[in-house]
Amino acid sequence: MPKRTDLQSIMIIGAGPIVIGQACEFDYSGTQACKALREEGYRVILVNSNPATIMTDPDMADATYIEPITPEVVARIIEKERPDALLPTMGGQTALNTALALASDGTLEKFNCEMIGADATAIDKAEDRLKFRQAMDKIGLESPRSSVAHSLEEALDGLDYVGLPAIIRPSFTMGGTGGGVAYNKEEFIDIVSGGLSASPTQEVLIEESVIGWKEYEMEVVRDRHDNCIIICSIENIDPMGVHTGDSITVAPALTMTDKEYQIMRNASIAVLREIGVETGNGGSNVQFALNPENGRLVVIEMNPRVSRSSALASKATGFPIAKVATKLAIGYTLDEITNDITGATPASFEPTIDYVVTKIPRFAFEKFKNAKPLLTTAMKSVGEVMAIGRSFPESLQKALRGLENGLSGLDPVEALVGANPSVIEAELARPTPDRLLVAAQALREGLPAEKICEITHYDPWFIARLAEIIAAENEVISNGLPLEAAAFRRLKAMGFSDKRLADLALQSAHLRGLGKAQAKGSGIVHDALQAMTGGVTEAEVRTLRHSLNIRPVFKRIDSCAAEFEAKTPYMYSTYEAPFFGEPVCDSLPSNRKKVVILGGGPNRIGQGLEFDYCCCHACFALEAAGYETIMVNCNPETVSTDYDTSDRLYFEPLTGEDVLEILHTEQKNGTLVGVIVQFGGQTPLKLAAEIEKAGIPILGTSPDAIDLAEDRERFSALVSELGLLQPANGIARSRDEAISVADKIGYPILIRPSYVLGGRAMEIIDGPSQLDDYIHTAVKVSGESPVLIDQYLRDATEVDVDAVADGDDVVVAGILQHIEEAGIHSGDSACSIPPYSLPASIIEEIKSQTDKLARALKVQGLMNIQFAVKGDKVYLIEVNPRASRTVPFVAKADGRPVAQVAARVMAGEKLRNLPEISWPEGYTAVKEAVFPWARFPGVDPVLSPEMKSTGEVMGIDIDFPMAFAKAQLAAGNALPRAGTFFISVKDSDKAQIVEPIKALTDLGIKLVATDGTARYLQSKGVPVERVNKVREGRPHIVDLIKDGAISLVVNTTEGWQSLQDSASIRSSVVLAPVPYFTTAAAAIVAAEAIVAIKARELEVRSLQSYHSMKHA
C-alpha cells in the first residue's frame, strides 16, 4: 500500500548521550529515519539531547530540539509542535521508554499523536518480562524457566522455583543494565536490589541459568501485510552468560545446521507476529539460546526496535534496516521499497552474503581503577570493530588488528607462554575480553581442543579454525616466509597482516640462535637472516609480498551474493584466490579527483562519536565542492560507514598496510588529491607519516606541524619564542629524573605520557610517594616516549578554543569556559559557550594567542587549544592542530558547519569565500559529560586528568543557569528543587560558596555538613546541621545517602588523603543515585541553576529558532 497521506508531521525521539549499551548506532538509525521521512515529504520534528550526532544537525529535521529526553520535556514539545505521529523505534531504550510513558500518561491521546512503527501494546509486550514470557507460551515457544518479581521478597520466593545459578534481567532496560548472574544467595540479593532500582517499572525477571549455551540472534523485518524477511543471522562466539554486546559475533551464523536455521527463522517470524499483532513492526531483533548437548532451543528476548545488532546487520549485508523500517512505519510494504544497493531488487528480497563478518567489542577497563575485567550479562564494552573477509580466519584477524589495541592478528598472550596447564585452564575459565586469544594460546601450549571447548563453551568449529591459524604460524616459525606466490597468498588469505608475519619470521630467526636486536639490526647478519626468513620487519615482508605480486582485491557488499550488480561502491578487501584464474578486483576506481578521509575506528573513551561527526561533515563538504569522497573506517555503529555518506566506502582496518593498499588501488584511475587525517582523532594521525612517506599528500596541517604540537620539547621552544606563558614543566625518561623534575617544579604536579588521546594515564600528584607509585604504570603506557611533568595550576579556570585557519586568516569558532577547574580532563568537564564569567580582556587575550599559534604552526584546517586562566594570567596548556571532540557542540551552538568549513579550507579554499563563523548571541549552550560509573561498581567516581566519560549532552537556553539545569537533567543528574543537601568543602572553597548556599536555604532547602564546613557556614549566618564523617562514627553521611535522606551532595577535596577519605561518599551517591559535585565552581553554578528552575518553568525551543535569533 502507498505511504500514508493522513500524516503531515512526524516526531522522532533520539537515544540521547552515548552510554555503554546505547551508542552511536542510534545516530546511524535516527539519521536514516530523518532522511527517509523528509524524502517522502513529511515535516520531521526531532528530539535528542546529544549534540555530537549527525541527526541533530539543523538541516536534518525541520525542527530540532536539543532538549532533555524525559516524558515531561517531550510532552511540552508535542504540545508546541502538535505532530501527527511519533516514531519511537529509532532511539533505543530511551525512546521506547519515553514513548511508553507518554502513552500511559495520556499525552499522545490528548494531542492526537499516533505511535507508528510499534504501538504501545507491542512495546509493552516485548519489554515487560512477564508479558513476553506469556506471549511465548501462547505461540508454543519455550523460554528459560523463570519468575517475575517486583520486590526482593518476591524475588527470593521465585528463587526457590528457578534455583541457582540464576540470571537477573530488569525490565525496560538496555545493555543488561542492573542485571547479572548470581551464583549464591548473597550475590542474588545484591543483583536483584540493583536490578529493581535500574528498572523504570521496578520489575526483574529471575531466569534459570543457560550459561554456556550457544547464543544466536535473528534480525527480522516485517511489514503490515505480514511479509517477513530475515536480514541476517548472527552467532555469538562467546556463550550465554556474556552480554551479546560484549561477545565476539559472526554473521552469518556459521555452526548451525540448515534444519536449526529454519526452525529459528520460523520462530523469529512467529515472535514478531505475536508481539506486533496489529502493526508493522519494521526492524526487530530476536535472541535465542541453544543447548549444544540436546538441541533445546529457548527464546531469550526480543527488541521491538532497531538495535545495536540492527546496525551490525545493516553494515554486514548492505540492507538499510532503519531506512526500510521507517518506510514501513508510514505505510509502505516491503515489495514497494527499492533496495538502494542494487537499484534493481525490492526490499522484500532476503539479503544473501558470500563472505564472513566478525564483530569484536572494544573495552576500557584500563580507565577505571579496581574495575574487574570480567564479562557478565551486564554490558561493559565502549565500542566495537567490524571486519569482512572471505573466510572466518581472514575476517577474525582483520577485526583483531582493527581494534587498535596493539594486536596485529591472533597474537600470543605473553603472560601464558610456557605457563603450567592449570594456570592456562584457570584463565580460560574467566570470561575476559581476551579469552579468544587465551584459547589460541592454550592451543599453542598444547592443551587439547576438547578441553578448551569444555572450559570455555566455545563451539569446536571455532577452535578448529584457531588451530588452522596456529598451524600456519608454526609453518612460518619453522621455515620462514614462503617465497612462492601461491603459498604466500594462502597466508594472507587467512588474514595474516604483514606485521604479524614479520613477528613470526622474527621468531624463526630467533630459533636460528639470534636475539631480536641482532635480527632487526643491519649489516651482513641481518641480510643473511632476511634471505633465510623472507624478512623480519613489516617493511621487508611488504617488499617481499609486492615482489611476488600479491595484493588484495576489493569485493563489493551487494546484499545478493553477486546475483545483481551493486550500484553503490561499498567494499572490503580479500586475498582469497579463486579456484581458476586470477583474483578479480571489483573496486573499479573512478577517473574523478578524489579525497580519502580516514575515520576513527572503534569507539573508545577519548575518541568517539564527535570525531565521526567531523569525518561525515568532511564528506558532505568535499562532495559539495566537487570531489569524490572516499571513506575508510571499520566501525559498524557510525554514520560514516553508511553506504550513502561518502561516494565510496572501504570497510577496512585503519592500519598502515590496509590503508596503503586502498590508496594504491584508488591511484590507478583519476587523481588522488590527498588524504585527510585531521578528523578521525588519534587513529589516522598515527598513519600520517607512513602515508606521506609513500608519496601521498596529507591535506591540511602538515604532519611535521602536528608532531611539533605533540612533542613537548619542540613545542616548549615555540611557546618561549612567541612569548606566551606555560605552566613550569619538564620531561623525564626515568624514575630518578621524574623525582628531580618534580622537586624543581614543586608539588602539585600533573604527570602524563606523551602522544595520548583522552588523557590516558594522566594524574595529579601531590607528593613524592604518590609519584613513586604512579611511575610504574606511566612508563608502561609511554613505551619509548618520555614522561611529561607540568606544574598543576590548582583552582584555575580551563578554557577550550576551537579555531579554523587557512594560512592567511584565523577564525575563532568558539571559546568554551569549563565549569570544573583546570586539571580535570576537558572531555569530562562541563563547559559553556559563550563563556559565562570570563572578562572581555581575557577573551581578547585568548583570541590573540590563538591567532599567533595558528600562524606559527601554519595550521590549515581545524585547531583546538586549551588554556588555563588564573587571576589575570592566561597559561597555554596544549595545542592540537586537528579536530577536537568539542567541534560538534560548537557547530550546534553556533549554527554554522565548522567541520565543513575546515574541510573546504584543507582542500585549498579560503575562509573569506566560505560561510562566516560567529558566536551565539542571546542564548547560552552548556555541554555536560555522561559517565559509566554504574557499570563499574567499586570504581571511585572521581574526575581527574584521565578521561572517563562515554558521551555528552547539551542544554540550551536564553540564560546560563537554566541551560546548565537542562544539561544536568539531560545527563540523568536532575537538580532537586527541594530536600536536604550535604556540603563538605576544602578550606579554600568555603568563602566562595557562602552566598550561593545561603540562597538555597532562603528557598527552604535544608543543609547538613561535616564539622569544619558546618562551623564555618554557621559563623556566616547560614542554617546548617552537623553530620559525622565516615570515620567519626555512625550514623554518618554515607548512612544518610543510602537511606535516601540526601538530595544533593557537594564534596570538594584537597590532597591525596582527603580524596581517599571521601571515596565512600562518591561511591554511595552513584548507587543512590544522587546529584553530586566535586568542585566549588560546579556547586556554585548548580546552586544558581536550582534558583533558576524554582523561579521559572523550563521552556522548549528548537535549535532553528535559537539560530534565527542569532542570525536575524
UniProtKB/Swiss-Prot annotation:
Catalytic reactions on record: hydrogencarbonate + L-glutamine + 2 ATP + H2O = carbamoyl phosphate + L-glutamate + 2 ADP + phosphate + 2 H(+)
Keyword Chaperone applies: no
Region (Oligomerization domain): 405-587
Binding site for Mn(2+) 3: Q866, E878
Binding site residues for Mg(2+) 2: E301, N303
SUPFAM superfamilies recorded: Carbamoyl phosphate synthetase, large subunit connection domain, Glutathione synthetase ATP-binding domain-like, Methylglyoxal synthase-like, PreATP-grasp domain
Residues involved in Mn(2+) 1 binding: Q287, E301
InterPro entries: ATP-grasp, CarbamoylP_synth_lsu, CarbamoylP_synth_lsu_oligo, CarbamoylP_synth_lsu_oligo_sf, CbamoylP_synth_lsu-like_ATP-bd, CbamoylP_synth_lsu_CPSase_dom, MGS-like_dom, MGS-like_dom_sf
SMART domains, per database record: CPSase_L_D3, MGS
GO biological process, one term: L-arginine biosynthetic process
Record has Transmembrane as a keyword: no
Molecular function (Gene Ontology), one example: carbamoyl-phosphate synthase (glutamine-hydrolyzing) activity
Protein residues bound to Mn(2+) 4: E878, N880
Involved pathway(s): Amino-acid biosynthesis; L-arginine biosynthesis; carbamoyl phosphate from bicarbonate: step 1/1; Pyrimidine metabolism; UMP biosynthesis via de novo pathway; (S)-dihydroorotate from bicarbonate: step 1/3
Cofactor entry: Mg(2+); Mn(2+)
Complexes and interactors: Composed of two chains; the small (or glutamine) chain promotes the hydrolysis of glutamine to ammonia, which is used by the large (or ammonia) chain to synthesize carbamoyl phosphate. Tetramer of heterodimers (alpha,beta)4.
Family named by the database record: Belongs to the CarB family.
Function of the molecule: Large subunit of the glutamine-dependent carbamoyl phosphate synthetase (CPSase). CPSase catalyzes the formation of carbamoyl phosphate from the ammonia moiety of glutamine, carbonate, and phosphate donated by ATP, constituting the first step of 2 biosynthetic pathways, one leading to arginine and/or urea and the other to pyrimidine nucleotides.
Protein name from the UniProt record: Carbamoyl phosphate synthase large chain
UniProt organism field: Zymomonas mobilis subsp. mobilis (strain ATCC 31821 / ZM4 / CP4)
Lineage, broadest ranks: Bacteria, Pseudomonadati, Pseudomonadota, Alphaproteobacteria, Sphingomonadales
Gene, per the UniProt record: carB
